[in-house]
C-alpha cells in the first residue's frame, strides 16, 4: 500500500474532517489491494509541512457534515467517555496528535469499548497520555482565568500550551450563563464569544480586533 499524508486545517474540525477522509482512503486501499492496513495513513496539521518521498500528499478541506458524522460515529460505537478522551487528546499541542488519534480509532472500531484494555498498544497509550496532560492543564486554567469588565462584556486573555478554549469554555458557560463574555487565546489567536443566554461561537484574530476596537470606540463616544 502507498503511504498517504492528509493535510488539514489547524483546528479541531479540520482534524475530524481528516479522520473521516482517512477511513475512506483506508477502506478504499484495503478493497483495492486486499491487504491488511498497516497504519500507512498519517494526518499533518496546518500548512507548510515537509513532503515525504514515496508518500502521496492530499489537502483536506474542512467539511462540517464530515465533522458531525465522525463525532456521532465515535459516540455511537465507542461511547461518550471515549469520545471525550479523543476530543481532549486532539486539543494537545503535539504535531502528531491527529495521526495518534487515527491509529487509536482504527483499533477502537475493531474492539469497541474494550479498547481501554489495550493499554500496551502505543496508539492507545499515547491517546490516553495526551488526554491526561490536557485535563491536567485544564484543571489549572479553570482556577486562574480572571475576567476584566470591558463594559459590554467580560474579557479574559490567556496563553495555554494546549488548545484549552474547547475544553474549559463550558465551565464558564455554566458559571456565567447570564453574562456576555469573551475568552481569547493569545497563543493561537482566536476567541470564544458567549452572548448571554445564547450559544457560543468562535471568532478569529481579525474579528476579535474588530470587536475590541469597536467596543473601545463606544467607550469614547
Residues covered by each model-derived region:
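Single conserved hydrophobic/aromatic residue that forms the stacking wall/gate
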Residues: 212-221
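Internal, well-folded beta-alpha domain core
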Residues: 114-202
Amino acid at each position: 500500500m502507498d503511504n498517504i499524508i492528509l493535510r488539514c486545517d489547524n483546528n479541531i474540525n479540520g482534524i475530524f474532517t481528516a479522520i473521516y477522509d482517512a477511513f475512506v482512503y483506508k477502506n478504499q486501499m484495503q478493497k483495492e489491494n486486499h491487504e491488511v492496513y498497516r497504519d500507512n495513513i498519517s494526518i499533518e496539521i496546518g500548512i507548510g509541512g515537509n513532503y515525504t518521498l514515496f508518500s502521496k500528499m492530499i489537502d483536506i478541506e474542512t467539511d462540517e457534515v464530515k465533522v458531525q458524522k465522525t463525532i456521532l460515529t465515535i459516540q455511537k460505537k465507542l461511547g461518550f467517555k471515549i469520545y471525550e478522551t479523543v476530543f481532549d487528546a486532539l486539543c494537545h499541542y503535539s504535531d502528531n496528535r491527529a495521526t495518534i488519534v487515527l491509529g487509536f480509532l482504527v483499533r477502537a472500531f475493531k474492539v469497541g469499548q474494550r479498547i481501554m484494555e489495550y493499554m500496551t498498544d502505543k496508539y492507545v497509550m499515547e491517546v490516553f497520555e495526551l488526554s491526561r496532560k490536557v485535563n491536567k492543564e485544564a484543571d489549572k486554567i479553570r482556577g486562574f482565568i480572571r475576567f476584566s469588565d470591558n463594559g459590554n462584556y467580560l474579557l479574559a486573555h490567556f496563553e495555554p500550551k494546549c488548545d484549552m478554549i474547547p475544553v474549559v469554555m463550558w465551565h464558564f458557560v455554566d458559571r456565567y450563563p447570564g453574562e456576555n463574555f469573551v475568552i481569547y487565546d493569545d497563543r493561537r489567536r482566536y476567541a470564544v464569544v458567549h452572548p448571554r443566554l445564547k450559544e457560543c461561537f468562535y471568532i478569529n484574530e481579525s474579528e476579535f480586533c474588530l470587536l475590541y476596537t469597536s467596543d473601545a470606540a463606544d467607550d469614547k463616544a
